[in-house]
């Protein structure tokens, strides 16, 4: 019997299409806050790890290869694993079309992610 992949089943049914997408490179420590928009949100971790939380929910650690699909984005906090509690939120710096950087300008990139908003087909 074939193993059923629940995420693949959901994606097949919803057929989401990216309305907005960007690739973000991050250098620790960093933190991003976003207000809830109510739009479907996705995040794919291409390389590295981070911590993500929606609204007042618990934070979850994401690793390379992890994918998050939120049907209606609430307030979002996403940050490096070593972020001090008092670090203010960073504003992503646009490097080029669809390419952004967050965190220190020096040092190695510790996270690459593809994030954006989507809608059903």
Predicted regions and their residues:
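N-terminal leader segment of winged-helix/HTH proteins
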Residues: 1-9, 13-14
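Alpha-helical transmembrane segments
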Residues: 13-19, 117
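N-terminal regulatory/effector-sensing and dimerization cores
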Residues: 25-121
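Short amphipathic
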Residues: 19-25
């Amino acid at each position: 019997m074939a193993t059923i992949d629940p995420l693949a089943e959901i994606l097949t049914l919803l057929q989401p299409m990216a309305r907005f997408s960007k690739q973000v490179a991050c250098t620790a420590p960093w933190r991003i806050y976003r207000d809830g928009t109510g739009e479907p949100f996705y995040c794919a971790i291409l390389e590295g790890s981070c911590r993500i939380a929606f609204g007042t929910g618990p934070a979850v650690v994401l690793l390379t290869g992890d994918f998050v699909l939120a049907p209606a984005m609430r307030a979002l906090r996403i940050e490096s694993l070593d972020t001090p509690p008092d670090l203010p939120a960073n504003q992503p710096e646009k490097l080029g079309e669809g390419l952004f950087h967050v965190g220190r300008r020096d040092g190695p990139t510790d996270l690459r992610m593809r994030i954006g908003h989507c809608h059903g087909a």
